[in-house]
Amino acid sequence: MNYDSILDNISNIIKIDENKKEKLIQYASLVIDYNKNVNITGAKTEEDFFNDHIADCLLALDIFYDYDNIIDIGSGSGLPSIPLAIIFNDKKFTLCESKNKKAEFLRLAKDKLGLDNIEVKCINAYEIKEKYDTITSRAFSDISTLLKIFNKLKTKKSKLILYKGKIEKIEEELKEANIQKNKYNIEIKKLESKDKERHIVIIS
């Protein structure tokens, strides 16, 4: 797979240098190797994981550019935070994962990739005491559930940034969440994905 061609088309703002490209590829390798014994992804090859998951996370680079002190809820195999932490090595990321085996992988990845800007918490999100500027999540839960977590972890200026798919599903989840329009600002941004319909939902 031509990783360079994928990454070169990701962002107009962020330059992904060779060291960061190598770390992204190494991360994919770590995931697939760990997945042989512990199920952390449905991807079968490094190429599939890179194309379907890492590249997808990086589609929102421009959106995360202005945010810091980020917590990833239900991080799983490290998505979206590990790819983001590789690119934004000056930003702090907290990876929240309640399952021990997955949290063990996140610590392994942190060590192998030399990511001093991430912290792994093996804890239920509702038990977290700290506040965060940015709360994000990908393929973890619906908007209603994540909004409850957001309300517990947010400050007055915090934002909830969610990776989501089809607009119809997003609208359905927003309706089910019964969000008070006068209480929250909701922004939906379409991501430039060639293969599937992808959006970012920003709630503040």
Swiss-Prot record:
Its EC number is 2.1.1.-. HAMAP family: 16SrRNA_methyltr_G. Belongs to the methyltransferase superfamily. RNA methyltransferase RsmG family. It comes from Brachyspira hyodysenteriae (strain ATCC 49526 / WA1). One of its GO terms (cellular component) is cytosol. Keywords: Cytoplasm, Methyltransferase, rRNA processing, S-adenosyl-L-methionine, Transferase. One of its GO terms (molecular function) is rRNA (guanine-N7-)-methyltransferase activity. This is Ribosomal RNA small subunit methyltransferase G. S-adenosyl-L-methionine binds at residues 74, 79, 125-126, 138. The keyword Transferase applies. Specifically methylates the N7 position of a guanine in 16S rRNA.
